[in-house]
């Protein structure tokens, strides 16, 4: 039956939202650690993006199913669906706040790194490394002496 398909869809969305909650918590843990591990953070970000893409697909499927059977969230006439929908809304709201918090943490890291780079650039005047990533020939301490 079509209502059962909708119920399955909502159950799948709930599972994904729970997974996303775990991923957002991992992301927060990484952002709160003293030093961010870029590769680990990138993996978490990719995992988050994958879950969000699947959620978007499931939600589009939900909307199509709703249209086909002429029903609409919050499903007040179908208690089993209404309960799932309410849980989805609660999880989504919590995730919104978690994601906002993580965005603020990330912004703080970016600002800190920008300030650190500004200090390094003003103290040294020139970059220590050339475009190829190798150390430049000029010495910052004075003259070069060959032996």
Curated annotation (Swiss-Prot):
Keywords in alphabetical order: Bacterial flagellum biogenesis, Cytoplasm
UniProt signal peptide: none
InterPro entries, A to Z: FlgN-like, FlgN-like_sf
Biological process, per Gene Ontology: bacterial-type flagellum assembly
Origin superkingdom: Bacteria
Tagged with keyword Signal: no
Main location class: cytoplasm
One cellular component (GO) term of this entry: cytoplasm
Pfam families: FlgN
Subcellular location: Cytoplasm
Similarity section: Belongs to the FlgN family.
Function field: Required for the efficient initiation of filament assembly.
Protein name: Flagella synthesis protein FlgN
Organism: Yersinia enterocolitica serotype O:8 / biotype 1B (strain NCTC 13174 / 8081)
Gene, per the UniProt record: flgN
């Amino acid at each position: 039956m079509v209502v059962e398909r909708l119920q399955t869809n909502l159950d799948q969305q709930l599972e994904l939202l729970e997974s996303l909650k775990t991923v957002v918590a991992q992301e927060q843990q990484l952002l709160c650690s003293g030093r961010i591990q870029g590769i680990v953070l990138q993996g978490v970000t990719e995992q988050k993006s994958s879950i969000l893409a699947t959620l978007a697909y499931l939600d589009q499927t939900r909307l199509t199913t709703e249209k086909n059977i002429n029903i609409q969230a919050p499903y007040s006439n179908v208690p089993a669906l209404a309960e799932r929908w309410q849980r989805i809304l609660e999880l989504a709201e919590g995730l919104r706040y978690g994601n906002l918090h993580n965005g603020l943490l990330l912004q703080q890291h970016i600002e800190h790194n920008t300030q650190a780079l500004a200090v390094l650039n003003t103290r040294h005047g020139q970059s220590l490394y050339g475009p190829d990533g190798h150390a430049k020939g000029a010495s910052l301490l004075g003259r070069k002496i060959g032996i």
